Amino acid sequence: MEVLGKQKVLAMMKLNGAGQLTGYPFETPSSSTTTPSVPPSFPHSSNPNAYMKPSPPSAISSPPSTSSCSSASEKKECAVCKNPNSSGYHFGCIACAACSAFFRRTVVLSRRYYCRRDPVGNSLCPLDRRHRSNCRACRYVRCIDMGMNPSSVQNLRDSIKPRSPAEMIQEAEEEDKKEKLDDILFSAATPGSWISSTSTCNEPLPVAPKEIPGENYIETLAALYKNSVERRRMFYCNGSLREMLGGTGLKMRPTRFDERYYKEKMRFELVLYVEMMNSMSVFRQMDLDTKETLVKGCAVSLAMLEKYYISVKYDGLRTQKLIAPDGSYTDLSDHGAQFDDEFTQITESVMDKETCLKLLYDPLRSCLNELGSALEHSRMTDTEFCALFAILLFNTAADNLSDASRNAVVMARNRVMKDWFEFYAKQGIDPHEAGLLVGNTLLLLTAVRNAMAVHRENFHVIRVFNVMEYDKLIDDLAFT
């Protein structure tokens, strides 16, 4: 056993009336299990603490007595996670077995963590008995702040023969799984826990998705969205082969009254969105139920957002034209003049033109002015659209998500935020300006939600009064 300095020994242990060492065990960089011997008595002095440095809470603070002996046997809470059942001093501070094992694994395996809540590195995540496994980066920072010393950790401690890196990693993963299971069982019986009280051991443990080195979600989405625009141009091109191959831009044309919900158009657009979602490894790794829940909750919102984004991009806010991805537009400034011929040809219309315009098109004008103005003010580009695409996809408030799936969605959204800032940094954008761009983009969510409510009411009128035929797939997208 390594001989510790006199001041450190007294700061970590207590002396009872008989001169025997009592209190909490402490770890030293040694594999020896022998009981430490009683240190030699110190010279008498009128002030026994004169040569001592300030001590931690367990240091000598009063003359030995019966009460002090009884308090020495009481448990102290872990300095890291506030677990009341600490196991003593570990690597320099009072800690529980779980936190000391976590610290040892981190140092031995040379692990590096980052906080998904704050990529800058500030420790913002809650750290207590229930949430200590949520963010390893903040947990390790807390360990260091509380006094744990990485140099006190010995590699291959208590090992008879050298272990391979694969064996060490496997052992660490098993310990992580046991700790998470212990946290789940604790949280199931604790009020206010983020885990449902109905959680059982059979429920899948929340695990961090496997990450591909160098993958940036925003960069991937932006590249794929650019390809999707080109695919749309070729798919919706009604011209010659030369026009299709020549890269002619988006052609504007007035839309038909009943064209908005064509079957072929809706399914093609949904395929493009799913391709963008599958480009992110975190989405591909999710189970089918989670994917279905997330897509149902965001598909219509994404289609609506992109329509207004395209409208602003092609000056639709000034001309009061709502432009679809295929180039068809609805002129909201002519009071439905573009549909005069269609209304005259309909012999058994369920409602007259004035009523139809009042219920269906006047609300769209309000949405264009509100959401379109917000998009223009935020200076949205393809980058911000793709970032908002991912934010809407990874909706942590989505219904019918299990605890494990919801935790994976939270980690995915935090990863999106991190990659968003990193993408701006690669482009040489100042961090302050990047923060403004991110903040202004996130503020659009309120306008998106308001516009979505109007479109939902709009479609409800169409469905109830059978104003036009629509693809029944939309009923499966949580739009009704």
Curated annotation (Swiss-Prot):
PROSITE patterns, alphabetized: NR_LBD, NUCLEAR_REC_DBD_1, NUCLEAR_REC_DBD_2
Pfam families assigned: Hormone_recep, zf-C4
- Report the DNA-binding ranges: 75-155
The NR C4-type zinc finger ranges are 78-99, 115-138
Subcellular location(s) of the protein: Nucleus
Sequence segments annotated as region (AF-2): 470-480
Q: Where is this region: Disordered?
A: 24-66
Q: Name the source's superkingdom.
A: Eukaryota
Q: Which UniProt keywords apply?
A: DNA-binding, Metal-binding, Nucleus, Receptor, Transcription, Transcription regulation, Zinc, Zinc-finger
UniProt KW Chloroplast keyword: no
Q: SMART domains in the record, alphabetically? A: HOLI, ZnF_C4
Gene Ontology cellular-component annotations? nucleus
Q: What does a knockout show? A: RNAi-mediated knockdown abrogates the increase in adipose triglyceride lipase atgl-1 expression seen in serotonin-treated animals.
Q: InterPro entries given for it?
A: HNF4-like_DBD (IPR049636), NHR-like_dom_sf (IPR035500), Nucl_hrmn_rcpt_lig-bd (IPR000536), Nuclear_hormone_rcpt_NR2 (IPR050274), Znf_hrmn_rcpt (IPR001628), Znf_NHR/GATA (IPR013088)
Feature: compositional bias, Low complexity: 25-36
Which molecular-function annotation in GO is an example for this chain? Answer: nuclear receptor activity
Q: Which GO terms describe its biological process?
A: cell differentiation; positive regulation of fatty acid beta-oxidation by octopamine signaling pathway; positive regulation of fatty acid beta-oxidation by serotonin receptor signaling pathway; positive regulation of transcription by RNA polymerase II; regulation of transcription by RNA polymerase II
Q: In which tissues is it expressed?
A: Expressed in the intestine.
UniProt cross-references to SUPFAM superfamilies, sorted A to Z: Glucocorticoid receptor-like (DNA-binding domain), Nuclear receptor ligand-binding domain
The UniProt record lists the NR LBD domain at 233-480
Family in the record: Belongs to the nuclear hormone receptor family.
Question: Its function?
Answer: Ligand-activated transcription factor. Involved in modulating serotonin-mediated induction of adipose triglyceride lipase atgl-1, thereby regulating body fat.
Cite the PANTHER family for this sequence: NUCLEAR HORMONE RECEPTOR
Name the record gives this protein: Nuclear hormone receptor family member nhr-76
Q: Give the species.
A: Caenorhabditis elegans
